[in-house]
């Protein structure tokens, strides 16, 4: 049986996470910045927050245990914020109109 679209989406998120992790299965700050720029350029552009300071703030907000790395659950929290923004846009909200960002 082949995977459903939802299953493929989740597998894709896991693959994206692993592309930027190290042996400890966590993303360090430089890799997170690269991941955001490579995978979410339209999101960053729409928010008009392309600068490193914005991305650094996102890292600090998502690094809940303050280990200077992003684990998988922290990564999912970041993706959730991005998905929430796109969902709001689907209902007519302007990009980056609020939320955890």
UniProtKB/Swiss-Prot annotation:
GO molecular function: calcium ion binding; calcium-dependent protein binding; RAGE receptor binding; zinc ion binding; zinc ion sequestering activity
Location of N-acetylserine modifications: 2
Any single GO CC term annotated in Swiss-Prot or TrEMBL for this entry: collagen-containing extracellular matrix
Location(s), subcellular: Cytoplasm; Secreted
One record GO biological process: positive regulation of ERK1 and ERK2 cascade
Chain residues that bind Ca(2+): 63, 65, 67, 69, 74
Chief localisation class: cytoplasm
Keyword Cytoplasm set for record: yes
Keyword terms, alphabetized: Acetylation, Calcium, Cytoplasm, Disulfide bond, Metal-binding, Repeat, Secreted, Zinc
EF-hand domain ranges (all copies): 13-48, 50-85
Disulphides: 47-96
Binding of Zn(2+), residues: 18, 25, 87, 91
Quaternary state and interactors: Interacts with RANBP9.
Family to which the UniProt record says this protein belongs: Belongs to the S-100 family.
Protein name: Protein S100-A7
Species name: Homo sapiens (Human)
Gene assigned in the entry: S100A7
